[in-house]
Regions:
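N-terminal low-complexity or amphipathic/hydrophobic leaders
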Residues: 1-26
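Conserved phosphate- and dinucleotide-binding cores of soluble alpha/beta proteins
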Residues: 26-186
Length: 187
């Protein structure tokens, strides 16, 4: 679940201002267990903390920020990502319960779209594919993917491997990826 994860891993000495579509700007990491204030939650109903200068605003203002192109990066989860950058993250098909949320606005309003996801499904099927099989959230919108196994860019209709787990061979990674990985040099 990507909601809240980026705020957990902000590098020391660097500052990012995080936005949640339910109306908080500049939230921080998750509070310690037992210290949650359930009036301070993100769009995924996870408790958050506030950083200095945080602000609250109406949901309509939040989506004006999103739709107005004021977000540098949207970080979303995914059921599937295609090598051309297509994203499927709101429906698992006829048997699932669809949940669009604000993802369609985010993929069109943010300057860049990054995905955080497991590399494979619970039953071991690749989530990174030549083409998505599920209903799309956005067409050609994803530029970077952070999976449980690798960091992959989407460029010129290809998956470009940037980083991988050190103990994982490229062949093993390719075997669980549903499209060819381009390896531009040492990884």
């Amino acid at each position: 679940q990507p909601l809240g994860q980026p705020a957990q891993y902000e590098p020391p000495g660097r500052e990012a201002v995080f936005h949640t579509e339910n109306g908080i700007l500049n939230f921080g990491e998750s509070p310690a267990s037992g210290a949650e204030d359930w009036d301070l939650i993100n769009a995924g109903k996870k408790a958050v903390t506030l950083k200095p200068g945080a602000s609250f605003f109406h949901h309509a203002d939040s989506f004006a920020m999103v739709r107005g192109g004021h977000l540098d990066v949207a970080i979303l989860g995914a059921y599937e990502v295609a090598q051309n950058g297509d994203l499927a993250n709101w429906s698992t098909g006829p048997k699932g319960v669809p949940a669009v949320g604000g993802a369609m606005d985010l993929v069109h309003g943010a300057k860049r779209v990054a995905v955080i996801t497991g590399h494979v499904t619970r039953d071991g099927r690749p989530k990174l594919l030549e083409r998505c099989t599920l209903p799309l959230t956005g067409v050609g919108c994803v530029t970077r993917i952070y999976t449980s196994l690798a960091v992959i860019d989407v460029a010129d209709g290809r998956f470009v491997l940037r980083e991988k787990l050190p103990a994982l061979s490229i062949d093993a990674l390719q075997a669980v990826t549903g499209a060819r990985l381009l390896i531009p040099g040492p990884v």
